[in-house]
Amino acid sequence: MPKVALFNQNGSTNGEIELNASVFGIEPNESVVFDAILMQRASLRQGTHKVKTRSEVRGGGRKPWRQKGTGRARQGSIRSPQWRGGGIVFGPTPRSYSYKLPKKVRRLAIKSVLSSKVIDNNIIVLEDLTLDAVKTKEFAGILKGLSVEKKALIVTADANETVALSARNIPGVTVVEANGINVLDVVNHEKLLITKAAVEKVEEGLA
């Protein structure tokens, strides 16, 4: 089982914690992680693109000139696709880009990125994370004490509004609950700060 240092929020170590090898100690599968990221990014797309077909653009109900005798090419409507202002053929329509990977694949992907954080020594396990009031300056001091200078994902066991509001204005810092941890968030942040209670919750859900 992988062991990592257990920190308190003042930045000092308080022993070690053993992580579940089936969640934090597997061989990362980059291909599965890539597929999971594509799935998440696809589901984030709005898909509200829309153009009008010849049946939707205004006008064009009357034949612009008679069929024969004018010397011009025959036309049936001024809203045919070849006309300026005409309808679009096979243009984009509103659609959902989201799709689902199999549950086992999604679980393998999140285990892979969590294991990568352990391998790269980019995981910090906190004994607890509590603030008496919403204080961005105080929270920034906690991060500094833990030597977190780049993008960080904070994972708490349950919803913690005080922590979430304190971290909201710090660039590159995101707070999520343990049951909302996902591949894209973990990959997009260099450091993973997770409380001991959140570790237990993640292990319970993935082991």
From Swiss-Prot:
Q: This protein's superkingdom?
A: Bacteria
Q: Which GO terms describe its cellular component?
A: ribonucleoprotein complex; ribosome
What Pfam families does this protein's entry cite? Ribosomal_L4
Q: Is Transmembrane a UniProt keyword of this protein?
A: no
Ranges of compositional bias, category Basic residues: 60-71
Q: Which NCBIfam families match?
A: rplD_bact
Q: What is this protein called?
A: Large ribosomal subunit protein uL4
Q: What is the scientific name of the source organism?
A: Bacillus pumilus (strain SAFR-032)
Top-level taxonomy: Bacteria, Bacillati, Bacillota, Bacilli, Bacillales
Q: Which gene encodes it?
A: rplD
